[in-house]
Regions:
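Flexible "arm" and connector segments at domain edges
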Residues: 1-126
Length: 126
């Protein structure tokens, strides 16, 4: 079955109860940002050591899940690029770090800049 990104996000959110995170929004976003960074790193590692398509697809699926959960939690939506704009595994990991940088701001008592956060999400999707 083929899903749109919106369908995937809603399906992932409906199943997220098994990954329920307590606390306030900042704590949930911090968890999701750490997960996104971790999975992007695992994807980059799988690519670099040649773990094969199955491992890479599994890690990329995990990246997609965390990105969907961040979108669900914030109400922001990533803008998906065309295939020829794909930054590669290291570019994706770098952009996941940009999302984490945005998410940690509220934990430091600073505002979460919606425009900057949107650009970071778009970067991970790219």
């Amino acid at each position: 079955m083929t899903m749109t990104w919106d369908e995937f996000r809603e399906e992932a959110a409906s199943r997220a109860g098994m990954h329920a995170i307590g606390g306030d929004v900042s704590a949930r976003l911090a968890y999701l940002a750490l997960g996104l960074c971790g999975e992007a790193g695992e994807y980059a590692h799988a690519q670099s050591v040649g773990d094969g398509d199955t491992a890479c697809i599994s890690e990329l699926g995990d990246v997609a899940w965390y990105l969907a959960m961040i979108e669900h939690a914030t109400g922001l939506r990533a803008t998906w690029p065309t295939t020829d704009e794909w930054p590669g595994p290291l570019g994706m990991a770098e952009r996941a770090g940009a999302v984490a940088e945005c998410v940690k701001r509220p934990m430091q008592g600073r505002d979460l800049p919606a425009e900057r956060f949107q650009l970071a999400l778009d970067g991970v999707a790219a």
